[in-house]
Amino acid sequence: MEMLQGLLLLLLLSMGGAWASREPLRPRCRPINATLAVEKEGCPVCITVNTTICAGYCPTMMRVLQGVLPPLPQVVCTYRDVRFESIXLPGCPRGVDPMVSFPVALSCRCGPCHRSTSDCGGPNDHPLTCDHPQLSGLLFL
């Protein structure tokens, strides 16, 4: 009986290993296409731009006894390599710099979230919400 249980366990483990080696059920951390709303205080317009951002699944762990042991650091999908592109917002009044920069993800990684450079919160309910009217044209510089 023990031998049969051992063979069954071995069979289940070998099938699980083959299943786990395939493409993950959740997409891993990687650059994806996204549309961002860009506006600036003092300029009466909002422009949407197409860029790449980091998104996807990063494996994390939680302690079972959370009250006894300190929490484990959690990782997020964040930029590894990034460049910034700039656009000129049309219609800005004299004295207001019309240039606005936005990130373009070149590669991503799972790592700690640095609040100084990233939004560490969850997804926004309205990521394309603007305070000003939207324009459809872009001026890349």
From Swiss-Prot:
It comes from Gorilla gorilla gorilla. Residues 1-20 form the signal peptide. Heterodimer of a common alpha chain and a unique beta chain which confers biological specificity to thyrotropin, lutropin, follitropin and gonadotropin. Disulfide bonds join C29-C77, C43-C92, C46-C130, C54-C108, C58-C110, C113-C120. GO terms for biological process: G protein-coupled receptor signaling pathway. The keyword Glycoprotein applies. Glycans are attached at N33, N50. Promotes spermatogenesis and ovulation by stimulating the testes and ovaries to synthesize steroids. Coiled coil: none annotated. GO terms for molecular function: hormone activity. It is found in: Secreted. Keywords: Disulfide bond, Glycoprotein, Hormone, Secreted, Signal. GO terms for cellular component: cytoplasm; extracellular space. This is Lutropin subunit beta. SMART domains: GHB. The keyword Nucleus does not apply. Belongs to the glycoprotein hormones subunit beta family. CDD domains: GHB_like. InterPro entries: Cystine-knot_cytokine, Glyco_hormone_CN, Gonadotropin_bsu, Gonadotropin_bsu_CS.
